[in-house]
Amino acid sequence: MRRVTVGVIGSGGIFQGAHLPGYSDVQEAKLVALCDVSEEVLKNAEKRTKKLYLERVENAKEDGKPELAEQLKGDAADIRTYKSAEEMLSKEDIDLADICTPTKFHNPLAVMALKSGSNVMVEKPMARTYLECLDVIEAVKDTGKLYQHNENWLYDPIWYNAKKFIESGIIGELQLVFVATAHGGPEWASWFWDPEIAGGGALLDNGVHAITASWYLNGFEKSPVAVKAAEPYGICIRMKTRLLQGMFKPFIVEDDAHVLIRYEGESGGWSTAHVEGSWSHRDSMETRMIGTNGEIQPHEDEKGVVLKIVDSFGSIREISLGKRTWTMSFGGEIRNMCNCVISGARPVCDENIGAETTAVVQAAYLSQKRGKRAVTLDEFKEYASTLREKEGKDAPKVLLKEMLGAIKVYA
């Protein structure tokens, strides 16, 4: 079996907590190098990686898989570390670069890795701004390499199985999707609250999951055509201060966002999604997919995940999907990209999906800026293009400032 050599750029939280468990379970991937600018983070990542791989060695032995045990043992011994992406990309024969840095560095590192001859996958969001996404799209075209926008929800049993039932026609034609992704906030990492680094708040962090998932459910053959910051909250700041770096501080990125998206297909069909991206817990409708003949409602408890399908007469069918773990979907995206590299197939969730998702986010900011008026994607892109012509290389920074300027404390 051919194995894909992988170098990780950014070895901190999302790599150690989510990607790393996936790598140890994906035989198609051979993790050869870790890179991080922080020596402390890098040492910890190396230690955790080798520890986990050696634990998997023992598991493989117990399962009667000596060849797998030897492979994992060799992988653990071979991992090398670097403090700069440039050095790693120049010294290693990397098939695939996995970029797990804060958002500000996504697009320059992706472009660098593509130009070095590596295929690339990048943790969501693709970049801080739509204009930065365009730089990556250009690099993909110039190099002919593959790019995967890492939206792990596509590999989660809830969304994957809901998509199956929607395509089967069991609820008729999909009309409306509610997708909420919310938690209490990432106070543990100061960079999330810095727009210069993060590019936005809860909408760009959590909300992109909901946006791409709602698009996936509707079908990537459709396109997002219009966006509206939804009443009453729109995109706003719900808490005036947060405990950041050990003390109460004000902040300027949104901690709550409610957005309406219209999707249209070439045949004239259309549907709507309401998405919430929040760091102040959910206050929108629970996730559900509503069709002309019924709806799908996902639920999860200690027994596992259940999809409840309710038809137009109120009859209920429950589909048990078993238990899931938080990290299993990350293994799915890693395996998918490795097999794309091996086969040469384009990832389903590619650079265009990533860029359009970012465009939806920024069109929502523009809608908020314009009093929550609906904004078409074409309208937003013309706005961004005009800024690019006027501001040149400073355009992404100006666009970022203008889009976030309308976010205020909700009162």
Describe the function of each predicted region:
Residues 247-257, 262-333, 379, 384, ...:
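NAD(P)-dinucleotide binding in Rossmann-like oxidoreductases
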Residues 1-116, 134, 138, 142-143, ...:
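N-terminal glycine-/serine-/threonine-rich beta1-alpha1-beta2 phosphate-ribose binding loop
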Residues 14, 40, 323-334, 358:
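Active-site loop of classical SDR/Rossmann-like NAD(P)-dependent oxidoreductases
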Residues 2, 40, 96-98, 339-411:
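C-terminal helix-rich "cap/oligomerization" subdomain common to oxidoreductases
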Residues 121, 127-189, 211:
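A contiguous active-site-proximal alpha/beta segment in oxidoreductase catalytic domains
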Residues 190-272, 276-283, 352-355:
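Rossmann-like dinucleotide-binding domain that binds NAD(P)(H)
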Residues 29, 79, 118, 145-146, ...:
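Short, well-ordered coil/turn segments that N-cap beta-strands
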Residues 112-115, 161, 333-343, 360-364:
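Solvent-exposed, amphipathic alpha-helical segments
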